[in-house]
Amino acid sequence: LEDPDGTRILYDPGFTVRGAGDPRLGKIDAVLLSHAHGDHLGPAHQATANAGACGKPAFAVKDVPNSNLATIAAGKQAKILAGSDMHLFLAGKVKAAGGDPKQVQLVRFGAMAKVGGVGVATVPAVHTNGVGPEFLDKGLGDMLRANGLTANLGPPVGYVLRFTNGLVVYLSGDTGITAEQDVVVRRHYKANLAVINIGDVFTTGPTEAAYVIDELVKPAAVIPSHANEVATQGGKVIPGTRTDRFMKAVHVPAHVPLSGRTMQFDGSGRCVAGC
C-alpha cells in the first residue's frame, strides 16, 4: 500500500512475495503482520515469478526458521509493526536475518503509530495465532510437533491505516465476525475501504464477509482477499467461486485484485484508477 507522500507498507507477505529482492517491492517503509500462521509469515517463497501453476504454486526457496517476512524487513531495513506478543518473537527473527531488533515496533489495541504520514492502528480479530514448529529452535519445535502444539503469540489482529489523502483502510487479517468491526472500525476509525478475507471454514466465508461489509463496517468499497481458490481466469471472476459468491452478495462496489494491476483510491474510498 502506498501513500501519496511516498510511504510504502507491505501487509502479510506470506508466500506471495519473492523475498527482499522481489522487483515488485521497491522501497518498503514498514511491514505489517496480522498473525503468525505460515501463510502470512512465510516459510518459503517462489524462486521466480509464476513458478508452478496458479492452483499449485512452487515454493522452492525456504525461509525457515527466520520467515519470509523477517528476511524482507531485514533486507529492506523496514519497520515491522505488530500487535499482541508478536513483537519479541519477530525481533529475534529480524536479528537472525541480519537486521536490527529495534526495527520491530509494538502497536497494542487502542494505539496508533505513524509510518511517514500514515497512521497505523491494530484492531481485534477472531482467529488463532500459533506459530508453527518450523519457525522455532529445533528442540522446542520438535517437542511441540510431537505433542500436536504450536507456540501461541497472543491474539491475532487486523489493521486500520489512515492515509494522508483521507483514505481509511481496514485490513481484516484472518477473522470471523466481530463486534469491533462496527464499534471500532466503523464508528471510531470510520474506515471507507476494506480488504476482507472470504476464505470460509477458517475465517469469514463469502456471505459472512458480505454481512460484515454491508452491516458492520459499511465502507464505500471493498477488496476481497484470501479466497483460498483459483478465483479468476483471463482477468474475469470464475462463476461459482467464493469470490463470485461474495461479489454477488455484497452491496458496495467490490474490486477484485489482479496480478500486475495497481488500484488507486481517493480519500472517500472510491476507486479512481485500476479497477
Where do the language-model regions lie?
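Active-site metal-binding motif and surrounding structural segment of the metallo-beta-lactamase
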Residues: 6-9, 14-82, 89, 96-100, ...
